[in-house]
Amino acid sequence: MTFLLPRADGRDGVPRTVINLANHLVDGFDVEIIGLLRGNTEPAFEIDQRITVRHVMDVRPFGPDGERRNLSEGGVDEHGNAVTRKLLFERQQPSAVAPLDPRHWASSDQPLIETLRSVRSDVVVGTTPALNLFVGSYAPSGVAKVGQDHMNFVWRTRDQDERAMMCQGIQGLDVFVPLTMGDQRDYQELLPDATTWITAIPNALSWPIADRAAPVVDKVVVAAGRLEEQKAFDRLITAYAPLVASRPGWRLDIYGSGSEMPKLRRLIKQLGVGRRVTLRGHSNQMPAVLRGCAIFAMSSEREGFPMVLLEAMSVGLPMVAYDCPRGPAEVLRDGVNGRLIPDGDDAAFTAALTELMDSVELRRQMGAAALADAAAYSMPHIVTRWEAVFARLGVHPEPAVR
């Protein structure tokens, strides 16, 4: 089977979750990963050596020999002047097939089409709306065409053009796999006459589930994710600010990196909470970090499927999250494994944090429930669900391997 990614070497959640799945499917299937654009020499996430990896276009600014590449490959303009990769991307003409996705260019259309036509797998899996369009239109006949999406229905259908692209892409597939049951229902209602089978499968946990729940005694509220606009860490900091004075023994640690870091630093300084609110940067030891905390907080304005909540559940942390579209409500059971707060209600978010801060018994009770709920997102469970999809398409694991 072949997975098609915008970037096989990307650092965001899409390559992370797709590579995680591919690394486990390779035990029973021949697996290939194709990245549209190659921007780094090494992948950000470990890829099993049994998986074949190839890239459609190499946009690294430097080649293996350290020499700058030409414009078609990235790094210099037509006059030989060095340009940033951002500027180089901005100079590209939009794709004729998927003009709404800035990662697709007119110059990348034909190479991607030719790459798809060369695929010899039984199944091709697109992982974005744009890639689903290409899979549905250009994957070889006789190949099962599967599409994923890692963002929610509400966001994808927010305007007419986005909605049209989603509908066209889905209808060219044999199977479309959104991340949540809510998305499944919405797409089925949007496309009642589509022959495409629409069935939801969530992402799997990135690491094993802990044997026992975290002790939740250290007075640390933790958050993690890319420091980008959609994650809305500014509203988490704002909601936490009153607790700096009322619960002085506690602190808020935020892990991650991104373009919003300067803005968040300014907000922390403006609110005067720098002694108790810290931007910790990226960590490669998140399971250990989470086990040393007491509460997990998520403030996103929108999600496809909130992997950070699964990771908190996997170590038995109680959670507090806004009920943003669309994933938190499918993971977080209000009053059972955490608190689900009406989207945008900062006062209620602050109150929920306070409630958990003041009761270690409640933290342990909700943390134990979170740990039990994590089993539904274990990798073996999610792989079994994917295998059922492939079996319906006539593709089965090889007995000799399994």
Language-model features and meaning:
Residues 282, 301:
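Aromatic "clamp/platform" in nucleotide-sugar-dependent glycosyltransferases that forms part
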Residues 105, 126-131, 149:
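Short His-centered aromatic/hydrophobic patch
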Residues 333-335, 339-347, 354-360, 375:
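Conserved acidic donor-binding segment of nucleotide-sugar-dependent glycosyltransferases
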Residues 318-322:
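Short hydrophobic beta-strand element within catalytic cores of glycosyltransferases
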